[in-house]
Amino acid sequence: MADQSTRPIAIFTAGTAASGKSTALRSTEWAGLPVVDPDRFKPLHPEYDPRAPELVHEWSKVEASKLRRKYLTDGVTHVVDGTGAKAASFCARIEEARAAGFSIKVLWVQCDLRVALKRNAARERSVKPEVVRGQAKTIPFTMAIATDIVDEVRVVDTNPKQTFEEWLYQNTDTNEY
């Protein structure tokens, strides 16, 4: 196998919708790399509605998969944008890249569920809150598995910086007392 420093790299993102994956990626040395992202294909579909992106998600995943496979075939270092919510498909894509001779890295972007839900609600292109909640439950399981099959996992916390008092105020439901 080629020296890891000379092998192409596949960087996989993981984190809930609205966790800040794109923002976190821009702050790394991987900023500017080609990104395989189903969301970038969605606006190209004639029936795309930013308020219901799930309607064209399967189509956009197929298009993104074609591009990802081209990068693997051509040996292009790239980023695969995703949530990591489905362990089987996340790990299968990792294994596919590994089999193609790539070094594998994961950028795991973490934020509190309340933060992700608030960011998601503020977006034009949002996903259903129950989807974000489901992702928050399954991503840690996926990462527990993926950690054993990748070369590096980088964790980035995108929670807003705040004082303890601010956090307590935002995370306490006064109706509970």
Give the ranges of each region predicted by the language model.
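Short catalytic-loop micro-motif centered on adjacent basic/acidic residues
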Residues: 78-83, 106
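Short, electropositive alpha-helical surface patch
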Residues: 86-103
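P-loop (Walker A) phosphate-binding loop of NTP-binding proteins
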Residues: 16
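Conserved beta-strand scaffold positions in the cores of enzyme catalytic domains, especially
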Residues: 33-35, 106, 153-155
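Conserved GTP-binding G-domain of TRAFAC-class P-loop NTPases and closely related GTPase folds
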Residues: 4-11, 19, 30, 114-177
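Conserved phosphate-donor/acceptor-positioning beta-strand/loop module used by diverse small-molecule
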Residues: 98-119
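Conserved substrate/cofactor phosphate-moiety recognition/catalytic segment
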Residues: 22-78, 88
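Acidic, metal-coordinating catalytic cores used for nucleic-acid/nucleotide bond scission
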Residues: 81-90, 113
